[in-house]
Amino acid sequence: MSPRASFLNKQLAKVAVIAALLAERVDGVWHVRSLGAPHIGQRPEDELISAFAERLAELHPTLVSFNGSSFDLPVLRYRAMIHGIAAPGLTDEYFKRYSTRHVDLCDQLASFDQRAKVVSEVW
């Protein structure tokens, strides 16, 4: 079985942890701080998703991920729907392929060519 074929189906995935850093440039100096990494041992999945979506709506950050547009963000959206969470922060510009609000490094490295993605080789 190929690594790509054995990868977890997005519709079956559950959120176990959401970790994020916030980088802000103030007077030419970058400041990086953790937004935390709560996990399901601390809070239920619906609270993790709701809190993250609220932070996105509040901060309007540019997201940087690796394969986030193909896996992480769709999983968050599916799980929000399953839990009945209104998550406007998860339906914004982050899902548009060439968005300036979400930089997916996997897509960038592959020049947006699905055949050139390195995900299957990483796992």
Language model segments and positions:
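Short catalytic helix/loop segments, enriched in acidic residues and glycine
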Residues: 1-15
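A conditional alpha-helix N-cap/helix-loop micro-motif detector
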Residues: 42-49
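Alpha-helix capping and helix-coil boundary motifs
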Residues: 1-3, 44, 118
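Metal-dependent phosphoesterase core characteristic of DEDDh/y 3'-5' exonuclease domains
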Residues: 13-42, 54, 58-123
